[in-house]
A protein has these predicted regions:
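Hydrophobic transmembrane alpha-helices of multi-pass small-molecule transport proteins
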Residues: 45, 49, 108, 120-139, ...
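Structural motif at transmembrane-helix junctions in multi-pass transporters
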Residues: 27-33, 80-98, 175-179, 225-242
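Juxtamembrane helix-entry segments on the extracytoplasmic side of multipass membrane proteins
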Residues: 2-5, 27-35, 59-65, 137-160, ...
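Glycine-/small-residue-enriched transmembrane alpha-helix faces in small-molecule transporters
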Residues: 1-35, 39, 73, 143-171, ...
Length: 297
């Protein structure tokens, strides 16, 4: 195993795990923060894309570009919904539900690509769903108002949009990761520019701006660089295991710095979610399922 690549992956996931904490300190809305994040990522990753020479070697195919732009819409919505979830619920709960994305991908593969799903996978889906209910808190489901204000919907929507990004983007093979992210963040700028009020950025403290720019340049620029640079050098099994550094760091920061104290039911829910996800990611893929995969229209 490439130890340098593994270290880069661990650092990138650990940094991304702190994004919930950063979000809480920015003092701006989810939409405004994602808007700045898209601008920072476009500048940082676009600059690397040019400096490293990847831009000159890109193979542009119309279908891949369209697919990338569609992924961009879901990627930006994923960020907005995740940040809204951070505003409404604990970071631990939001990040646990957000990590249900692989479960959604499993379901989509079964419904649209004819991939086989066995009884163990169905059980994993059910366990993850129950876990998400436990994490939010059963008391939040006693009334419609409590449910709508719990942040559960935002967290589920963020997981779904992240899953759509993975599902639609799985057949993008010619464009580099820098090109796809550059195009997707450009989409985000155009999506959010009409709805973000510049008045939100007036009266912010220096600390607010440091957290805002940190979310943009560190969590989107630097983290994505480390992630892309290490991803191609590591086996899929190692990558699948190391991505759990992200939620682990997020939950630790929530407990240690933000004083989140989960109930025993929430702890059980977190265990259910990540148990189901780990099984889904690490279970062997039947050859028949691989053979049945086809490109999306």
């Amino acid at each position: 195993m490439n130890k340098s690549a593994a270290l880069q992956m661990v650092v990138s996931m650990a940094l991304f795990g702190s994004i919930g904490f950063f979000t809480r300190q920015t003092g701006v809305s989810a939409e405004a923060l994602v808007f700045i994040r898209c601008i920072c990522a476009t500048l940082f990753l676009g600059g690397l894309w040019l400096l490293l020479g990847y831009a000159k070697r890109e193979v542009w195919q119309r279908r891949e570009v369209i697919r990338t732009l569609v992924c961009g819409v879901f990627l930006v919505l994923n960020w907005v919904f995740l940040f809204k979830a951070f505003e409404a619920m604990s970071i631990s709960a939001a990040i646990s539900i957000y990590n249900l994305a692989p479960i959604f991908v499993l379901i989509m593969g079964t419904l649209f690509l004819g991939e086989r799903i066995n009884i163990q996978s169905v059980l994993a889906v059910v366990v993850c769903f129950l876990g998400s209910l436990f994490v939010v808190g059963i008391e939040q489901f006693k009334s419609v108002d409590n449910f709508l204000n719990s942040g559960f919907i935002w967290a589920i929507l963020s997981a779904f949009c992240y899953a759509m990004t993975m599902f639609i983007g799985k057949n993008i093979q010619q464009l580099s990761s820098y090109a796809t992210t550059f195009l997707q963040t450009i989409v985000g700028i155009f999506m959010l520019a009409p709805i973000v009020s510049m008045a939100e950025f007036s009266g912010l403290s220096t600390t607010n701006w440091l957290y805002i720019l940190g979310t943009g340049f560190i969590h989107t620029g630097f983290v994505y660089y480390l992630f892309f640079n290490s991803l191609r050098k590591l086996p899929a099994l190692v990558t699948s295991a190391l991505v759990f550094v992200d939620p682990l760091v997020a939950i630790l920061l929530d407990v240690v710095i933000l004083n989140f104290r989960p109930s025993w039911l929430q702890l059980l829910g977190i265990a259910f979610i990540f148990g189901g996800i780990i099984y889904t990611l690490l279970k062997p893929v039947p050859q028949a399922a691989v053979d049945n995969k086809s490109d999306l229209a």
